[in-house]
Amino acid sequence: MKSISENLKVSLTCLDGPKYKLSELEEYYIKLQENKEFNVNLVGIKSTKNWSFDKDFNFVHDSKKFFSIKRVKYNKTENGIIHQPDVGVLGVLTTQIEGVLHILVQFKEEPGNTNKAQLSPTIQATKSNYSKAHGGSLPPYWEKFLSIPKNNFIVDSLQPEQGLRYWQKFNQNVIAETDFIEEKQGFKWMTLGQVLAFTKFDNSINSCL
């Protein structure tokens, strides 16, 4: 059995892996950027549903869930800051494919991205996501993470978010080993070398990965 350092070294130097060649992943990524069905339009604050300013001029949701935008003052500067006290989860699944370490990456399309899709963790969820406060479905692979034994967790650590944008926000950062599982739409098993190679594309890798 390889040590962790040996697994990392092999994965970092593997560009054409047993699952995908790097060129196949690049082609997939480029096609996502050309997705004409994913369109984003800026709207005025007054056009948002169920959001409003409270008596203290914080921007909040009627349900008091999700997050709020509060005012902070520091160094004679007054800014808006995101207040989201619930702990989020940033999780990455790993597996061995023909002896090479792979991580399950989501090519995630989000409205605020400079590019349409970014390489992101397997799970990137707030409490509102995994408690289905928005009325939608659970994040992909959420139940898989819950079923993984604790001794399969390589990393399980509480870490802070960006303090310039979030007020005392924390995420549970998890890396867990699993048997090979099939990819859902928008997910790819990638070697660490393949992920690193994507840095040649500007704005391609989500900061949470």
List each model region and its residues.
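Aromatic- and glycine-enriched beta-alpha-beta binding-site module
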Residues: 65-131
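N-terminal domain-onset segments
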Residues: 1-75, 208-209
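Short amphipathic alpha-helical surface micro-motifs
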Residues: 50-51, 86-88, 156-158
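Mixed-charge (acidic/basic) macromolecular-recognition segments
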Residues: 1-26, 101, 111-209
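Sparse, context-dependent recognition of short Cys/His-centered cofactor- or disulfide-binding micro-motifs
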Residues: 54, 77-79, 160
